[in-house]
Amino acid sequence: MLITAVLFDEIQHSKPGESLPFIAHSGLVKTHGPAQISVSELIHQNRLPANPTQEEITWARNHFLDPEMNITLLAAKFQRLKLALGLPESLMLQASRSYLDAKAIATLTYLHNGKLDYPARVLGYMQDPELHGLIYDGRQPNPVITV
């Protein structure tokens, strides 16, 4: 639910045209894709060297434009931050389960975005019944169609 809530917020605040390749490669925006990931995150994840070449930066920006890769990088970022905070790798955080989980989620979201109002918004989205409905109630089997 954390990744869904972060994506929900990031998509609402996305900049017009930032998903276009020429904008991504122009250098006008530092974060890219639905998860708003930057080149520095790839360095933290050891997917790029500390001083990437222009070719490596271009490769990274191309990957940021792929939504599936972008969301995978967000999940890896949260996993990396969890380990840096000393949280167990296999721990699934649930804000409704405990105050400590909610605090850990707030810390992770702050470290992702860096804005003080961000954790409260994300925690709110994680409790949003409509967002829960989209994820958990919207799964319906495909109808059988006979022709």
Task: Cite the ranges covered by each PLM segment.
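Catalytic glycan-binding domains that act on GlcNAc-containing polysaccharides
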Residues: 1-146
